[in-house]
Structure formats: structure tokens, C-alpha cells
Amino acid sequence: MSNPKGSRKHFVPNHIGTQPRAAGGNKGKQMQDQSGQHAQVIQTKGE
């Protein structure tokens, strides 16, 4: 089956977790690679 849109590369699924994300707008890379740092916890409700 041919792709009618032509110049498409092989389809790469863009689901969450399939590709490493660079940090910038999306902080996924920072959260995964903490290198010994504690995660920053933002408290939204008093507990």
C-alpha cells in the first residue's frame, strides 16, 4: 500500500514514553534524569 501524501518518513509512534524528550517546555527529560537531586514537590493543598 502506498502513502498518497508522498514525502512521509516511516511512521514513528509519538506516544508518551516511546521517545526520549528533551527538556524545554516539556520537563520530561529533567524528571527522568535527576542525577541525585530530589524531585521538586509543589504543595497545592495543605496537609
Curated annotation (Swiss-Prot):
Transmembrane segments: none annotated. GO terms for cellular component: endospore-forming forespore. Its main location: other. Residues 1-12 have a biased composition (Basic residues). Residues 1-47 are annotated as: Disordered. Keywords: Sporulation. Belongs to the SspN family. This is Small, acid-soluble spore protein N. It comes from Geobacillus kaustophilus (strain HTA426).
